[in-house]
């Protein structure tokens, strides 16, 4: 892989934990983000800002979002931190299937089916959720 194509070169920490802000922007640029709907989803959203992979998009790039957080204390902070009509905030525990599957949760929102980015940060269950996405 040439150094020009390495995404690590674009690492930039604005709100993310390990520079994902810059890497995500570069990926969106490479896929021509001007043609995207500008919607993202983050579950395991915590307080909505600290180590968020979507907050930079919401704050600085006019994205709309669905932010999902299961923990009541973190969700309370998220509610205080994110005060915009561009964001749908949900206090839900995402499950593999049934009423609280990601698919069913998102069906109840106005997010388009072809949203642009999903960020999953649920401490060890990320793989199992991705495996069950439809």
PLM regions and their residue ranges:
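Non-catalytic N-terminal targeting/anchoring module and adjacent flexible stem/linker
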Residues: 1-9
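SAM cofactor-binding core of SAM-dependent methyltransferases
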Residues: 8-108, 117-120
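Short helix-to-loop capping/linker segments positioned immediately adjacent to catalytic or ligand/cofactor-binding
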Residues: 115-117, 129-130
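Short His-centered aromatic/hydrophobic patch
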Residues: 123
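A short alpha/beta connector and helix-capping loop motif
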Residues: 126-134
């Amino acid at each position: 892989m040439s150094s020009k194509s390495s995404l690590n070169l674009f690492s930039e920490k604005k709100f993310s934990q390990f520079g994902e802000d810059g890497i995500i922007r570069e990926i969106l640029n490479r896929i021509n983000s001007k043609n995207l709907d500008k919607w993202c989803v983050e579950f395991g959203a915590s307080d909505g800002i600290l180590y968020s992979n979507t907050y930079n998009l919401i704050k600085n790039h006019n994205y709309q979002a669905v932010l999902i957080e299961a923990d009541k204390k973190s969700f309370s902070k998220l509610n205080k931190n994110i005060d915009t009509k561009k964001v749908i905030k949900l206090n839900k525990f995402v499950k593999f299937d049934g009423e609280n599957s990601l698919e069913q949760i998102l069906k109840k929102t106005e997010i388009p089916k072809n949203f642009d980015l999903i960020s999953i940060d649920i401490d060890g269950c990320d793989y199992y959720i991705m495996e069950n996405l439809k």
